[in-house]
């Protein structure tokens, strides 16, 4: 029996009306403009565009050096002690329940003990909030600061998630420069010039992603004094504090919390090479209690109350992970990164259109300046990376993704052989696109480019 033969549309569902329903003007809902604006400044959007230019050529396999995740390479695997800490909790059954929004107390105590090793003004467990990775810490703190007309000062270049979340939270973004000629120090006069009565905070990243520098005690003190003068807090991202392979010691911004309130963001993803475990923290460095009296502590707690809490299994393992001596793990990782920096800088000497004036001392990236006048048919850093992906199946990150036009970021947190292959392809690409005119070579030899 054909059931459709007796089917009759109700009188109010005419054919014309059915067609009209495809007209979106009759519907009252729309996708979020905030999400569209925020995602437009994320690094992923650019990386996806670059991947779209790549091919499946098995003779020249894809080399993804645009984003950093050393954990995918066996040589960077975390230590067995760290893994066993989680395994022991898993087998005990003690990590199977929900936890408080701020994190379980043993985890908060472990983080407090860990950060206090380098602090004069100690933090208490109640000053610590456990988050789903450092990224959720960024989101919670920025959302807690958001109010009508408020603006926040972000570094340029920077980790793009700060701008994306500020935009999503309705904060106006103002960018201050990091100065390459001064080893990427913060332009403090520039900060004073752009701040106004609606400025609520400034963000610093130390050790710095993507520049790879480590700020000195004196410079950080000046940062704190500038923040105090402006009446703003300092948000400091210190997730790379265990990824330092240069000579400069790490100084936590919390050392200057007696000058201005400091909110420290951290996590185990970079130091312990376990980004997939998604454990980070917010630590409040504020001996004078300003964050509490201004409502920031309450706002952070309230924002955590409406977000998912971090996995209890890894939280319960934090006392073991942070309490153990991890010197061997850190030393091995940092030694490999330092060797990779030397490798890249040595090979870049053969590529005149890419220059690294300052070797990174930390993190898993290397920034190199693109000398466009030496190249033909290359418009800018984005064009360079798009054509490189298409011709060489090599993905590097254009500086524009970080707020630094005509620079290139190379990920060094990979296996050395991959870097060797990538640099060989990069050299070949640059040679093909190098201008053959005598004037360009003359300018290069005279140091004018």
From Swiss-Prot:
<dbReference type="InterPro" id="IPR015424">
    <property type="entry name" value="PyrdxlP-dep_Trfase"/>
</dbReference>
<dbReference type="InterPro" id="IPR015421">
    <property type="entry name" value="PyrdxlP-dep_Trfase_major"/>
</dbReference>
<keyword id="KW-0808">Transferase</keyword>
<protein>
    <recommendedName>
        <fullName>Probable aminotransferase TAT1</fullName>
        <ecNumber>2.6.1.-</ecNumber>
    </recommendedName>
</protein>
<keyword id="KW-0663">Pyridoxal phosphate</keyword>
<keyword id="KW-0032">Aminotransferase</keyword>
<dbReference type="InterPro" id="IPR004839">
    <property type="entry name" value="Aminotransferase_I/II_large"/>
</dbReference>
<feature type="region of interest" description="Disordered">
    <location>
        <begin position="1"/>
        <end position="20"/>
    </location>
</feature>
<dbReference type="InterPro" id="IPR015422">
    <property type="entry name" value="PyrdxlP-dep_Trfase_small"/>
</dbReference>
<dbReference type="InterPro" id="IPR005958">
    <property type="entry name" value="TyrNic_aminoTrfase"/>
</dbReference>
<comment type="similarity">
    <text>Belongs to the class-I pyridoxal-phosphate-dependent aminotransferase family.</text>
</comment>
<dbReference type="Pfam" id="PF00155">
    <property type="entry name" value="Aminotran_1_2"/>
</dbReference>
<dbReference type="GO" id="GO:0006520">
    <property type="term" value="P:amino acid metabolic process"/>
</dbReference>
<feature type="compositionally biased region" description="Polar residues">
    <location>
        <begin position="1"/>
        <end position="12"/>
    </location>
</feature>
<dbReference type="GO" id="GO:0030170">
    <property type="term" value="F:pyridoxal phosphate binding"/>
</dbReference>
<dbReference type="GO" id="GO:0008483">
    <property type="term" value="F:transaminase activity"/>
</dbReference>
<dbReference type="GO" id="GO:0009058">
    <property type="term" value="P:biosynthetic process"/>
</dbReference>
């Amino acid at each position: 029996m054909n059931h459709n033969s007796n089917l009759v549309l109700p009188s109010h569902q005419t054919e014309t009306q059915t067609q009209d329903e495809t007209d979106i003007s009759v519907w009252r809902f729309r996708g979020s403009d905030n999400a569209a604006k925020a995602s437009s400044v994320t690094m992923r959007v650019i990386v996806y565009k670059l991947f779209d230019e790549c091919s499946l050529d098995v003779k020249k396999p894809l080399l993804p050096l645009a984003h950093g995740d050393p954990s995918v390479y066996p040589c960077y695997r975390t230590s067995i002690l760290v893994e066993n800490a989680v395994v022991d909790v898993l087998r005990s059954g003690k990590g199977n329940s929900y936890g408080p929004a701020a994190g379980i107390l043993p985890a908060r105590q472990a983080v407090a003990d860990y950060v206090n090793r380098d602090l004069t003004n100690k933090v208490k467990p109640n000053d610590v909030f456990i988050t789903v990775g450092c990224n959720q810490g960024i989101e919670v703190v920025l959302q807690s600061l958001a109010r009508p007309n408020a603006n926040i000062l972000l570094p340029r270049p920077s980790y793009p998630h700060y701008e994306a979340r500020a935009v999503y939270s309705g904060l106006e973004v103002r960018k201050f420069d990091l100065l390459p000629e001064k080893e990427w120090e913060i332009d403090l006069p520039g900060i004073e010039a752009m701040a106004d009565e609606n400025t609520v905070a400034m963000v610093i990243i130390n050790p710095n992603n993507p520049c790879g520098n480590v700020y000195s005690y004196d410079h950080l003190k000046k940062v704190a004094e500038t923040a105090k003068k402006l009446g703003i807090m300092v948000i400091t991202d210190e997730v790379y504090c265990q990824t330092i392979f240069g000579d400069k010691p790490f100084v936590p911004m919390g050392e200057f919390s007696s000058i201005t309130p400091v909110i420290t963001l951290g996590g185990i993803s970079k130091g312990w090479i376990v980004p997939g475990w998604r454990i980070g923290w917010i630590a409040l460095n504020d001996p004078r209690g300003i964050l509490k009296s201004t409502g920031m502590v309450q706002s952070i707690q309230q924002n955590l109350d409406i977000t998912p809490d971090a996995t209890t299994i890894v939280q319960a393992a934090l006392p073991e992970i942070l309490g153990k001596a991890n010197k061997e793990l850190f030393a091995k990782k940092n030694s490999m990164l330092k060797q990779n920096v030397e490798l890249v800088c040595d090979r870049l000497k053969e590529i005149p259109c890419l220059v690294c004036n300052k070797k990174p001392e930390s993190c898993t990236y290397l920034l190199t300046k693109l000398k466009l006048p030496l190249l033909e048919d290359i418009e800018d850093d984005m064009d360079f990376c798009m054509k490189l992906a298409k011709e060489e199946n090599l993905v590097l990150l254009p500086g524009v993704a970080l707020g630094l036009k005509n620079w290139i970021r190379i990920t060094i947190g990979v296996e050395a052989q991959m870097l060797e292959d990538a640099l060989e392809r990069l050299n070949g690409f640059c040679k093909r696109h190098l201008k053959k005119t005598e004037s360009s070579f003359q300018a290069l030899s005279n140091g004018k480019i």
